[in-house]
């Protein structure tokens, strides 16, 4: 007998909560809809929140288009401490005494705008030699990683009451690591940095205002995943 075809098809726009992997979200939605064929477009780090585009049933075939879309994030960048994960979930591995102002931070952000080269962080799902980088990192090892070209079309910064914590809004191509961008900004200013409170507010044509919770977000028509495509 052939495999039973899925009976649930569509798109779901989730506001991913902190503390869950993108796969955790998929697992919960599989239980909710009783459907195995569920996938997501664009992985979010466990501590990150925001837009996660989900395809259910036959809609999974269209996820590659959503995955390739630009993303927009809001994030806080903490200057001074470097961590092994490049975000606040990691262990501090270096401390830098830094003093920065708006002109300096804006200029450094501008230098990281446009087409740039990024080296994937060790704690990431990228594969090297057939293994996930985070698996290698868990063994306490670091390996060489090839840089890749990404495009940052917007990198806006603003100060907060804390002179070493800055807010940023970033619009970038798929595959851009915001953790790496924050660390590179710290390096460009002669020190170090890590990020916290990362939130994806837009994924392609889908905004965070359209999202819902894992339990309550509605199943949308498959055609939602063709939004913005050329006719």
Q: Which positions does each model-derived feature cover?
A:
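Catalytic/RNA-binding core of pseudouridine synthases
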Residues: 1-231
